[in-house]
């Protein structure tokens, strides 16, 4: 825990850029060593006066507050020293020292992860193409990444979820800050089925300058980046250029020659910086040999078929009515086993009887700290009392007699 506290201290220094943070841990070996370094050592590194002052502030209060916030919100901290930290990010000169994760922990190095990026102000064609790509990629076994903005981001994420896959949203602000607010429902769906990621601690506002910095993580986690619609000067092109610098494949959807919203993507194709794509198959064919265990040959959808499935996603599905024989399908266990549980595991089991919830929801409803909830879930599942469903949802696997 002490090592993590020092790491959070370092990453919250005022005026610290990602490349400088990475350089400091390379120079000192660990964040703890940087914390205890002599102030004169900072000055020898040609750091700004503002950053040197911030490094001289040894208060750990904010770091400890962040740890408390993560515990309360059910946010997992993944550091560059952890075995699960993506090698894809460690290859970057400005890798994030910490990732805050709300939802599932993915092994990104093993995933055919494709980032779909594009403009907030997009055309109906762009929305349709982003949704179709997200859907087709998810159906074929790829992991779709994007931001959470209106337009292309939202369409891609919705498509991926409708395609039956998880999705990952990389945010510029904290993982608990939904921006724009109208995407609250989408945010919750992505967190339940996949993950929300950020390098910034909970509560960080999504200020404009944070988005270009965020983009290196979006492209860095991915095997490839697909640009759907972008003007000639846009954040999408920043992400595409970052991807090229990171030796990632770049793909682009063509648009009308005179369409302002396709000027950026058409330019990528014209300069040979991106491969022209018309469907997800044009992306998948590049990765079949690298990810044979991931790519599934899902039958291609027509444009009309994809649109129909995406439109159906907006319609709430009716609640299934159980048949009489299904009303109590769970195996019966003696009540003495329930009484032998501790108070917290028993409360969690009772909450999950007849419903499926993700850990965040359990924390919110029981007010049990996230770490103890996760421990209880692991034990209850190991004892056969709980089942884990897709989207990291848990539900009761047994019932107890009266």
Model-based region annotation:
Residues 1-84, 268-271, 385, 392:
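Short, small/acidic-rich helices and loops at N termini and domain boundaries
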């Amino acid at each position: 825990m002490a090592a993590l506290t020092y790491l959070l201290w370092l990453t919250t220094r005022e005026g610290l850029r990602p490349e400088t943070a990475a350089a400091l841990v390379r120079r000192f070996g660990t964040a703890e060593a940087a914390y205890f370094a002599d102030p004169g050592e900072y000055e020898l590194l040609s750091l700004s006066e503002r950053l040197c002052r911030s490094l001289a502030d040894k208060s750990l209060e904010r770091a400890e507050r962040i740890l408390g916030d993560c515990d309360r919100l059910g946010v997992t901290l993944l550091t560059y020293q952890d075995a699960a930290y993506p090698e894809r990010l460690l290859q970057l000169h400005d890798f994030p020292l910490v990732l805050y994760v709300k939802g599932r922990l993915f092994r990104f190095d093993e995933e055919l992860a494709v980032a779909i990026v594009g403009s907030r102000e997009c055309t109906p064609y762009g929305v349709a193409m982003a949704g179709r790509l997200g859907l087709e990629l998810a159906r074929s076994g790829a992991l779709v990444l994007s931001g959470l903005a209106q337009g292309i981001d939202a369409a891609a994420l919705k498509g991926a979820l409708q395609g039956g896959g998880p999705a990952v949203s990389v945010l510029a602000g904290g993982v608990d800050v939904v921006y724009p607010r109208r995407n609250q429902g989408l945010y919750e769906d992505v967190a339940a089925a996949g993950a929300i990621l950020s390098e910034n601690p909970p509560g960080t506002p999504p200020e404009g300058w944070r988005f270009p910095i965020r983009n290196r993580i979006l492209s860095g986690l991915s095997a490839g980046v697909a640009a759907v619609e972008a003007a000639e000067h846009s954040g999408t092109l920043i992400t595409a250029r970052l991807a090229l610098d990171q030796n990632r494949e770049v793909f682009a959807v063509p648009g009308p020659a005179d369409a302002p919203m396709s000027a950026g993507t058409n330019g990528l194709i014209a300069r040979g910086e991106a491969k022209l794509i018309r469907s997800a198959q044009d992306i998948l064919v590049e990765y079949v040999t690298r990810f044979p265990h991931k790519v599934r040959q899902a039958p291609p959808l027509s444009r009309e078929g994809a649109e129909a499935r995406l439109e159906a996603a907006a319609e709430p599905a009716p609640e299934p009515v159980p048949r009489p024989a299904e009303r109590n399908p769970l195996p019966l266990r003696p009540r003495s086993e329930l009484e032998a549980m501790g108070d917290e595991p028993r409360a969690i089991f009772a909450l999950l009887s007849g419903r499926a919830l993700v850990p965040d929801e359990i924390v919110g409803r029981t007010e049990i700290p996230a770490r103890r909830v996760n421990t209880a879930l692991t034990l209850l599942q190991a004892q056969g009392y709980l089942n884990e469903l897709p989207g990291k949802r848990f539900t009761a696997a047994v019932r107890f007699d009266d």
